[in-house]
């Protein structure tokens, strides 16, 4: 058997027989921090504009990683359920641990839904741990950096979301005062003309009202910003086609989720019926689900939500698949700074990143959850060079904004 050290010695003598798989000793302990073990996994929920689920992974190397699962109930219990599958494992084996959790939870819904969201939060925290152990930013763990900053689009709301003029005024304000050059408004708002919203059919006056919103915003903003509009899976295929057709003259950035997310055949028909770009993806899980949108080119823009779809590496894989069809990625995001930065790290590392969503511009303390300042400036996120995600959780701020009944991480 040839030892590893002998293979590295230019003066060592050995035969080709010595190099056979049966005779080479390939044992090479990683050593040092690379032999770290996971000791604990904890969660807490923060009462933001959504109930954000923060995840902490602890190691015997003294390094703690922070992640975020997609908001809502259930994930914390699932993460607690998965903790025994992680304790004692090496946190650097991110891809193996991801598949390990999927397999372990295969009888409990690991193909999609809350289990994948919970795994996503753990996976993000593992990237934070790995970056800190290896002293590299998280983007280096998913391919390296294409850009130093990521374009951010701001999801906007007004007190009267059905008022076209109110939407136009808010769009102008955010562009002029906050510096964004990309914004989004909702179109699934009441028009006052509905007869039966349950059937998802849009009557002509309803479509006219939505066109009025689009016209008011795009004319007010002009060339200063790209403007997208979100439908939240609200309409029939026929209604979606008619609406998209009516918007073709307004050069909208994209129309998002016009039909329910389950039937990708209908989604393809809508997309191929119009020159209005169609964006879909936040309600579709893992690379397997996204593939059924990308391969038939049922979308013009893919919009996965990283803390929901499977985490950082899964989003990178989705972006690679999208790139095969020349489809850009505009990540959906309603997260705290943790999930947002995880998304930004991946957006920096993929060639086809279009923009990243920001959904908390009206929440004054969003940035207080971390010690770093000025995360978003003039509609862009600069990617930090610090190890891991590059953010430090402010535990005092987390405690101040926890969901009632939650407890803070036990850092002892």
Curated annotation (Swiss-Prot):
InterPro entries cross-referenced by the UniProt entry: DgoD-like, Enolase-like_C_sf, Enolase-like_N, Enolase_C-like, Mandel_Rmase/mucon_lact_enz_CS, Mandelate_racemase_C, Mandelate_racemase_N_dom, Xylonate_dehydratase_2
Protein name according to UniProt: D-xylonate dehydratase
EC number: 4.2.1.82
CDD domains assigned to the protein according to its UniProt record, in alphabetical order: MR_like
Function: NADP-dependent D-xylose dehydrogenase involved in the degradation of D-xylose, a major component of hemicelluloses such as xylan. Catalyzes the third reaction in the xylose utilization pathway through dehydratation of D-xylonate into 2-dehydro-3-deoxy-D-xylonate.
Keyword annotations from UniProtKB, A to Z: Lyase, Plasmid
Induction comment: Transcriptionally up-regulated by both L-arabinose and D-xylose via the pentose-specific regulator XacR.
SUPFAM superfamilies the record matches: Enolase C-terminal domain-like, Enolase N-terminal domain-like
One of the record's GO molecular function terms: xylonate dehydratase activity
Class of this enzyme: lyase
Quaternary assembly: Homooctamer.
Entry's Gene Ontology BP terms: amino acid catabolic process
Organism superkingdom: Archaea
Catalytic activity: D-xylonate = 2-dehydro-3-deoxy-D-arabinonate + H2O
Recorded phenotype for the gene knockout or disruption: Impairs growth on D-xylose as sole energy and carbon substrate.
PANTHER family tied to this protein: D-GALACTONATE DEHYDRATASE (PTHR48080:SF2), D-GALACTONATE DEHYDRATASE-RELATED (PTHR48080)
């Amino acid at each position: 058997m040839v030892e590893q050290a002998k293979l590295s010695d230019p003066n060592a003598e050995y035969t080709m027989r010595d190099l056979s798989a049966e005779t080479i000793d390939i044992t090479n302990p990683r050593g040092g921090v690379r032999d770290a073990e996971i000791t604990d996994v904890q969660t807490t929920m923060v009462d933001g504009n959504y109930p954000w689920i923060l995840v902490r992974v602890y190691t015997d190397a003294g390094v703690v990683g922070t992640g975020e699962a997609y908001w809502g109930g259930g994930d914390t219990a699932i993460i607690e359920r998965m903790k025994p599958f992680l304790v004692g494992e090496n946190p650097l084996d991110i891809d193996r641990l991801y598949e390990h959790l999927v397999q372990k939870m295969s009888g409990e819904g690991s193909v999609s839904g809350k289990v994948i969201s919970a795994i996503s939060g753990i996976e993000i925290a593992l990237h934070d741990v790995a970056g800190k152990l290896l002293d590299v930013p998280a983007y280096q763990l998913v391919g390296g950096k294409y850009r130093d900053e990521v374009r951010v689009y701001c999801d906007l709301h007004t007190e009267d979301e059905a008022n076209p003029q109110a939407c136009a005024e808010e769009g102008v304000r955010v562009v002029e005062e906050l510096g964004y050059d990309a914004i989004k408004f909702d179109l699934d708002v009441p028009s006052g003309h509905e007869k039966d919203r349950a059937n998802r059919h849009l009557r002509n006056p309803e479509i006219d009202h939505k066109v009025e919103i689009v016209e008011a915003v795009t004319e007010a903003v002009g060339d200063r910003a790209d403007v997208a509009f979100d439908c939240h899976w609200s309409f029939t295929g026929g209604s979606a086609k008619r609406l998209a057709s009516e918007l073709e003259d307004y050069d909208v950035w994209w129309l998002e989720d016009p039909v329910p997310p389950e039937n990708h055949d209908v989604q393809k028909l809508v997309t191929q019926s119009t020159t209005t770009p169609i964006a879909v993806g936040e309600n579709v899980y893992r690379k397997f689900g996204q593939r059924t949108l990308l391969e038939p080119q049922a979308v013009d823009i893919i919009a996965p939500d990283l803390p929901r779809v499977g985490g950082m590496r899964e989003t990178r894989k989705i972006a690679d698949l999208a790139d095969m069809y020349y489809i850009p990625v505009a990540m959906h995001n309603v997260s705290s700074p943790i999930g947002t930065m995880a998304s930004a790290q991946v957006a920096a590392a993929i060639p086809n990143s279009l923009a990243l969503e920001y959904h908390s511009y009206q929440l004054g303390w969003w940035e207080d959850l971390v010690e770093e300042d000025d995360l978003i400036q003039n509609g862009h996120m600069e990617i930090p060079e610090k190890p891991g995600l590059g953010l430090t959780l402010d535990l005092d701020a987390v405690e101040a904004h926890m969901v009632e009944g939650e407890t803070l991480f036990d850092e002892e």
